[in-house]
Amino acid sequence: MAKRIIYNEQARRALERGIDILAESVAVTLGPKGRNVVLEKKFGAPQIINDGVTIAKEIELEDHIENTGVALIRQAASKTNDAAGDGTTTATVLAHAMVKAGLRNVAAGANAISLKKGIDKASDFLVSKIEELAKPISDSNAIAQCGTIAAGNDEEVGQMIADAMDKVGKEGVISLEEGKSMTTELEVTEGMRFDKGYISPYFATDTERMEAVLDEPYILLTDKKIGLVQDLVPVLEQIARTGKPLLIIAEDIEKEALATLVVNRLRGVLNVAAVKAPGFGDRRKAMLEDMAVLTNGQLITEDAGLKLDNAKLEMLGTARRVTINKDTTTIVAEGNETAVKGRCEQIKKQMDETDSTYDKEKLQERLAKLAGGVAVVKVGAATETEMKDKKLRLEDAINATKAAVEEGIVPGGGTTLTHLAADLQKWANSNLSGEELIGANIVEASLAAPLMRIAENAGANGAVVAENVKSRPISDGYNAATGDYIDMLAAGIVDPAKVTRSGLQNAASIAGMVLTTECIVADLPEKKEAAPAGGGGMGGDFDY
């Protein structure tokens, strides 16, 4: 396909046009008085949302060159989303401000490479300052405030996430599901839960609720299919003597063996239940090993030279209680903290080493199941459109609270970046010179952009608000919801330091890339061929 090649100023201006379009569409959502954006969907109802990165992903322009600008700034938003899970709109507004200021300097003859160096050095300095400013949080109240701000000032959501964090701890997983009612509810599971239920309903001990509840059971873990009941007989005999229940977790149990277990269960010879192992392939094995660590048992696998027919009682795991229904199994075990801690550290190391987001997610899930539990927030809303918007806000709120627990909090509402402008100017004047200093000044001039936009969305004059904030103490900022200047930390208007840091780093990175662009190679727009002329009369007895 033929390409269009554009150089110098013309290339940068085309990118700028695309960046302007995207930044304006996203910036309208910023702050407590930010508006919503409606996304038209080819199929289904339109979506009304307030989430920067989701809007950015939807924007495609007709002009290929302008679309390249959109894609670049979209990257700033999605990288921030990947790192911190929130702050995507702030990253977009910052990147836009840096690009606008930088392009003016490049047009005036500044060297783009030196400007980029200055931008990078300024960004590194600011990151270290944000780390210094960050206050660690531990109390539930501060966590709730963080969630409230990220969810668009919804206090109920903030409190719910703080409760969930309290119950499942730092390593726990908080997942979102679409609820069945109008209200949003929180459901917390203690212990390890996985999505496999009993193989046969005959294992249920409570026929009304169709649940199998085993107290203080032995747990047999194996990664192979159990085909013959003879393999199980030695273990079953040993357990029958103890009078305790048994849970079997295996890849599968064939009909003959299953029938024998069911008959024993119904006759009251042995209280037994069988469940298929969760996951597939290597992941299944890893999850079974996690269960073995949790229940203080051994995974009976041929890789370790162990066979079912010579399994001993001491190889089996134990738990305080196991609850099984048709879809899920929950194991509540205790008293094996040291081994579980070691296993958790091992999983954390694997998480640090992997680059795949999917693998990281799965490892995080395993970690949560081992370390303390899973909380499920069931999102309730009147309509599907509202449900989708609520779900995105909740996702941001969960990510923001996790980021806050990780790296601490800073004053919110664009306040931190605005105050840091003076520190950056002082540092740049004494450490940088020439065009690198101009690069740092570009960053310094852009730092107030998020605050100005928050103020403008609330109907105030952005430039005036920014100047007023700069003249006040470092934790003071502008509360756009009320129009007052207040101590942001005391009022609970806070941002996670990680969100502020990621947004700034990604914005600086994209701005540097755009400024150093000297040529764009893009596809030529395809010429639409005229439709062929209609055929003549078809003849015959019919009118066509």
From Swiss-Prot:
Reactions that this protein is recorded to catalyse: ATP + H2O + a folded polypeptide = ADP + phosphate + an unfolded polypeptide
Subcellular location: Cytoplasm
Binding residues annotated for ATP, in chain numbering: 29-32, 86-90, 413, 479-481, 495
GO-annotated cellular components: cytoplasm
Domain of life per record: Bacteria
UniProt GO BP: protein refolding
A Pfam family annotated for this UniProt entry: Cpn60_TCP1
Keyword RNA-binding: no
MF terms in GO: ATP binding; ATP-dependent protein folding chaperone; isomerase activity; unfolded protein binding
Keyword field contains Cytoplasm: yes
EC number: 5.6.1.7
Disulfide feature: none
PROSITE patterns: CHAPERONINS_CPN60
Keywords assigned by UniProt, alphabetized: ATP-binding, Chaperone, Cytoplasm, Isomerase, Nucleotide-binding
PANTHER family documented for this protein: 60 KDA HEAT SHOCK PROTEIN, MITOCHONDRIAL
General function of this protein: Together with its co-chaperonin GroES, plays an essential role in assisting protein folding. The GroEL-GroES system forms a nano-cage that allows encapsulation of the non-native substrate proteins and provides a physical environment optimized to promote and accelerate protein folding.
UniProt similarity note: Belongs to the chaperonin (HSP60) family.
Official protein name in the record: Chaperonin GroEL 1
